[in-house]
Amino acid sequence: MTLFADTLKKYLETKNTTIYTISKISGVNRTMIQHMKVGKRMPANAADVSAIAKAMMLNPSETADLLRAYHISHMGEENYFRRENVSKIISSFYDMNAASELIIPTGMQDNLEMCEPLKAINGKANINRILKAILEIEANKKTGHIKIMVQPEYTYLFDCLTSIDFNRNQTLVEAIIVFDKNEGHKSTTYNLNILQKLVPILFQCEVFHPYYVYDNVDTLFNNTSMLPFKIITSDYVLAVSYEQDKAVLYNSPDMVVLTSDTFQKKFSVANPICHTFHPTPEEYLQASFMSDDEIQAEEVYELFYQPCFPSFCPENILMDRLNTAIIPKEMQQVIAAYFAKIRAQYSNHFISFTLEGLNLFMETGRVTEIPDFMYTYLKPQQRLILLKNIITSVDDGSFKPRIVRSDKLSVPSPLCICAPNEQKVIIYYFSPNKGQYIFHLQELSLVHAFHDFLVYLPESSMVYSEEESKKLLHSIYDKYTNIYC
């Protein structure tokens, strides 16, 4: 029996109706519904599930439950939960725009007085106070270095990394995090949750460098583990229990050396989770340009807030809008040649984008994937030319658009995700407060999860169909033609 069959059977038994009545109202074949109930068949699509739910008079919560069971049974638990978690990570980038200012370390370290080399601490509040104090002490040093061996379960530590200003003195913060090596959706979900916890820190703490090793997470970290979380500074070692209610603070040079050696041994076999940086204009162009092999790949999957407008931009408009004060003439020619290559291969690119992003471009001329300082917003007539070029490419079959349903997937305005192949995923993000960021995912389970999501997206219910997307593009073109002409 599938989860969908079990869920359908549950509602059939609790609702005062018959399969015959449900079939008549929903239009779904009665025999098909009977086969669904015993797990022999699956609905042809989500629309049939919604029709059955309506016929059974399920409330919104029950309808969502039945649809969720359908999607899990249709695509498999691991695929469902992996894709659900990737969509949550994508949507969570919204929170970055509201990131608060960092706190400059204060004199809280004055509360940390130790005469003995070690001190047992009980209670979360006391441990949190000590943790914050030793982090602030290190952040106030000119050559501070913090080494961390923790998991995302230690929420308060992760909160400290997004609130204390470690950037001021360039305090190096290195973290080793265990990724679950087991197969199945629980491990995949756990590893994706790690990335979701790290994203805010990577935005706020420029000196934070997370690394991963593979192991069995449940075995290493549980309520019987002996103080598994370690925070090491120049002067202190704080060892904390899994439940974060017991800890030992060491104020001993020998203990600092011992635990630092242990950290270093793990560090020698660890790898970066991702490479994150603020690019200069040259770095941005280098990072955003795909190689010839990537451009010519059989399939390239991308998710943008807007369509990839530069690829549909005639050279005369491109040169008119580029900021020539900061982009040398030879680089301008390189940019024009690059986008000409992209245009020639666009039939192999599967791009999903939002209606909101398209409307923003048509109203303002802003291209969110390009930093504002690199160009001048496009004029109304130039916007119409680009949209017309997109429509022409859609009509002749050289471009396959998919417009995202914003009620199904939230895509932040400055976000671009590109997967030129199964081994490479790059996330571009522009923060109004922090500027341009580039996230180059390194850990393979994360790379595979994002690549799988981008491949799945164009055929999912999170986007309009190709025909619906075409109609929307034509209607937007007609709307703004009437406004600007």
Could you describe each region identified by the protein language model?
Residues 117-466, 473:
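Hydrophobic protein-protein interaction segments
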Residues 27-44, 51-54, 68-71:
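Recognition helix of helix-turn-helix/homeodomain-like DNA-binding domains
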Residues 1-21:
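A short, Lys/Arg-rich alpha-helix, primarily the initiator
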Residues 47-50, 54-107:
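Short amphipathic recognition helices of helix-turn-helix/homeodomain-type DNA-binding modules
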Residues 8, 22-23, 33-36:
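Conserved hydrophobic/aromatic packing and binding residues within compact polymer-binding modules
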Residues 13, 24, 54:
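Alpha-helical residues within the helix-turn-helix
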